[in-house]
UniProtKB/Swiss-Prot annotation:
Localization annotation: Cell inner membrane
Residue ranges occupied by any tr-type G domain in the UniProt entry: 7-189
Keyword flag NAD: no
Gene Ontology CC entries for this record: plasma membrane
Record EC number: 3.6.5.n1
Keywords: Cell inner membrane, Cell membrane, GTP-binding, Hydrolase, Membrane, Nucleotide-binding, Protein biosynthesis
Protein name: Elongation factor 4
PANTHER family in the record: TRANSLATION FACTOR GUF1 HOMOLOG, CHLOROPLASTIC (PTHR43512:SF4), TRANSLATION FACTOR GUF1-RELATED (PTHR43512)
Gene Ontology biological process terms in this record: positive regulation of translation
Membrane-topology annotation of the record: Peripheral membrane protein
Function: Required for accurate and efficient protein synthesis under certain stress conditions. May act as a fidelity factor of the translation reaction, by catalyzing a one-codon backward translocation of tRNAs on improperly translocated ribosomes. Back-translocation proceeds from a post-translocation (POST) complex to a pre-translocation (PRE) complex, thus giving elongation factor G a second chance to translocate the tRNAs correctly. Binds to ribosomes in a GTP-dependent manner.
Family classification: Belongs to the TRAFAC class translation factor GTPase superfamily. Classic translation factor GTPase family. LepA subfamily.
Organism field: Methylocella silvestris (strain DSM 15510 / CIP 108128 / LMG 27833 / NCIMB 13906 / BL2)
InterPro entries: EF-4, EFG_III/V, EFG_V-like, EFTu-like_2, G_TR_CS, LepA_C_sf, LepA_CTD, LepA_IV
């Protein structure tokens, strides 16, 4: 590998909403610069996990180094950083963007600006990026490039008059994108003689190499055999391999300022390599770490239990392996009377939860039940202590509680005008507080403060269904606010079912409880005795349904004759049922749990 002057390096990322063609554009850039031989070209080269390809989303940051000979005759190194676009991975996005100096903003010329586009553009602007707008899919009959340019100027405030027009699918305009990267994005700044300072962008576990760390060198030089230190984790290692991605790994001797590449150092656990940490030289450390590092904080919690109790050990092993790769995922053991042994897991958000669950089921062949997702509540007790509550079943005695605080989010929703009424109604139902509402062309942008508790359940699905899939949604957690929350328990035959207990707002408890008991009534099969299903807050029953008993027709053998004879047989049956009900155990089928937890709030 020949060394390039720092002025000929460009580090850039691509910012886009799901399905606006980010990965396809990346494929075309890789193809155009000849980084991958034509026969090795697969769709979405950078999305390496199957789930990423199937869902069309990018989960981990990926990078590729492209070499490009520009129109001015100079050879440039272009480092493309493919970032996740989903809100759950917002912190990973901000770190990936911190590794670059510029971004391509890809907008679908037929769809226009979406909520996630906005969120990620703001991340890019916060990172001080130069942004080049790119209009994709101009080959579609529905494309309206002029209108979308105007929209970019109105909504984001970027000058879009020089936007690059492309069709990533057919390959039109890709060379213009490459020229724009070289001419309109700035080169990195860095001092080769200063002490080593590098940003840890991402890390993953490889069975042969241990942990592979994706780094962006800011100052100094990173060499093979160098002793390094991770500043936030305070871990020390010796670099044993350095290289760059062209998308396949290729070894190099060193990484200079402005370069993006990978290192391995026989690191055993991903927990030592935290995204956003600063890597420096052990002997000659840099004075201060790079700003913006935050340890990953789980936001959503839920219990994961194996359907078959015999799979518990396999589940434990599988979680350990996923944890190697994903330090933002945390778990601890828990047991539930209804579901047996399992784990209480913490996630960055709902998509993260779905992905982890899907990876456990897919990569490790496990059948899992997930309990209702819950958020972290802060409980201020009468004696002044504050505790964090991850699981509604562990709620302390209500008489000891002063206040319960719940997390709130600021949500930005972009929706076509026609569906605005339904969207506002949904936000109102979810205890939302309107902050702002304005129009962007034919679309409305509503900004709401909402309790996260109301969003984790099924808000996203409901939003998509009432807007026929057109509304887009993005959120950031803002603060904790006190709320009138109560713990709702579900009792089946007077026995509380711990897996179904949840914290709800007092105003919504009645409806939530009623829906839950009606749902369970359909799902629990009839037994030989009648089964009451109740929703309760403390000792007060707020909703009840009864599953009727199966009964034999005891009077069938009486033909005509005395009514008192029939009465006697019926009374005898009644007494038997009553006794049975005292001793009977109700079997709740697994499907009932799964369906009740998927319940539409």
């Amino acid at each position: 590998m020949t060394a390039h002057p720092i002025k000929n390096i460009r580090n850039f990322s691509i910012v886009a909403h799901i399905d606006h063609g980010k990965s396809t554009l990346a494929d075309r850039l890789i193809q155009q610069t000849g980084a991958v031989a034509a026969r090795d070209m697969v769709e979405q080269v950078l999305d390496s996990m199957d789930i990423e390809r199937e869902r069309g989303i990018t989960i981990k940051a990926q990078t590729v180094r492209l070499e490009y000979k520009a129109a001015d005759g100079e050879a440039y190194i272009l480092n493309l950083m493919d970032t996740p676009g989903h809100v759950d991975f917002a912190y990973e996005v901000s770190r990936s963007l911190a590794a670059c100096e510029g971004s391509l903003l890809v907008v679908d010329a037929s769809q226009g600006v979406e909520a996630q586009t906005l969120a990620n553009v703001y991340h890019a602007l916060d990172a001080g990026h130069e942004i080049v707008p790119v209009l994709n899919k101009i080959d579609l009959p529905a494309a309206e490039p002029e209108r979308i340019k105007q929209q970019i100027e109105d909504v984001i405030g970027l000058d879009a008059s020089h936007a690059v027009m492309i069709s990533a699918k057919t390959g039109v305009g890709i060379d213009l994108v490459l020229e724009a990267i070289v001419t309109r994005l700035p080169p990195p700044q860095g001092d080769e003689t200063a002490p080593l300072k590098a940003l840890l962008v991402d890390s993953w576990y490889d069975a042969y190499l241990g942990v592979v760390v994706l780094v962006r060198v800011i100052d100094g030089v990173l060499r093979k055999g160098q002793k390094i230190k991770m500043m936030a984790a305070d871990a020390h290692y010796e670099v044993d391999r350095i290289g760059v991605f062209r998308p396949k790994m290729q070894d190099a001797e060193q990484l200079s300022p402005g370069e993006i590449g990978f290192i391995t150092a026989q690191i055993k656990q991903v927990a030592d390599t935290r995204v956003g940490d600063t890597i420096t030289d052990e002997r000659r450390p840099c004075a201060q770490a790079l700003p913006g590092f935050k340890p990953a904080q789980p936001v959503v919690f839920c219990g994961l239990f194996p359907v078959d109790a015999a799979d518990f050990e396999d589940l434990r092993a599988a979680m350990g392996r996923l944890r190697l790769n994903d330090a933002s995922f945390s778990y601890e053991m828990e047991s539930s009377a209804a579901l047996g042994f399992g784990f209480r897991c913490g996630f960055l958000g709902l998509l993260h939860l779905e992905i982890i669950q899907e990876r456990l089921e897919r990569e490790f062949n496990l059948d899992l039940i997930a309990t209702a997702p819950s958020v972290i509540y802060k409980i201020v007790q009468r004696d002044g202590d504050t505790i964090e509550l991850h699981n509604p079943a562990d709620m302390p005695d209500p008489t000891k509680i002063e206040t319960i605080e719940e997390p709130w989010i600021r949500a930005t929703i972009l929706t076509p005008d026609d569906y605005l009424g339904a969207v506002l109604k949904l936000c109102q139902e979810r205890r939302g507080v309107q902050v702002d509402l304005n129009y962007v062309g034919k679309r409305a942008m509503a900004v709401y403060d909402l309790p996260l508790n109301e969003v984790v359940f099924d808000f996203y699905d409901r939003l998509k269904s009432i807007s026929k899939g057109y509304a887009s949604f993005d959120y950031a957690i803002t603060d904790y606010r006190p709320g009138d929350l109560v713990k709702m328990s579900i009792l089946v035959n007077a026995e509380p079912v711990d897996a179904l207990s949840m914290l709800v707002h007092r105003d919504r408890a009645d409806t939530r409880g009623r829906v839950m008991v009606e749902k369970l009534k359909e799902l629990i099969p009839p037994h030989m005795f009648q089964i009451p299903i109740q929703a309760a807050i403390g000792g007060k029953i707020i909703a009840r349904e009864t599953v009727r008993a199966l009964r034999k027709d005891v009077t069938a053998k009486c033909y005509g004759g005395d009514a008192s004879r029939k009465r006697k047989l019926l009374d005898k049956q009644k007494a038997g049922k009553k006794k049975m009900r005292q001793f009977g155990k109700v079997e709740i089928p697994q499907e009932a749990f799964i369906a009740a937890l998927k319940m539409d709030g």
